[in-house]
Amino acid sequence: MSVKQISIFLENKPGKMCEMTEVLAANKINMRALSLAETEGFGIVRIIVDDVYDATTVLKDAGYINKLTSVVVVELPDVPGGLNRILKVFAEDQINLDYMYALSAETSRDKA
């Protein structure tokens, strides 16, 4: 399955991530997944949200540079070696992974 991901560029300073997530929270946008990569001067926050259009709009209106891309979602069995089985398929097909989200979900959908 493919979903849209938003990449947001942030200054690498205390509180900047809090400010960005406040914009999303104030607009009732729920993050489903998050990944953060940082360098000395800036960070790239990659998020998957419940409302991509509204999220990109409110982020842009708040002054955040963001980019929308498609990512592949793979559900893995929750067993030892589950991830390895999928990675073998990628390796055999010469598919390179740039980054990945990892999420272990409980049966309850209302818990993060």
Regions found by a protein language model. Give the residues of each.
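Structural preference for solvent-exposed beta-strand-turn elements
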Residues: 1-80, 84-112
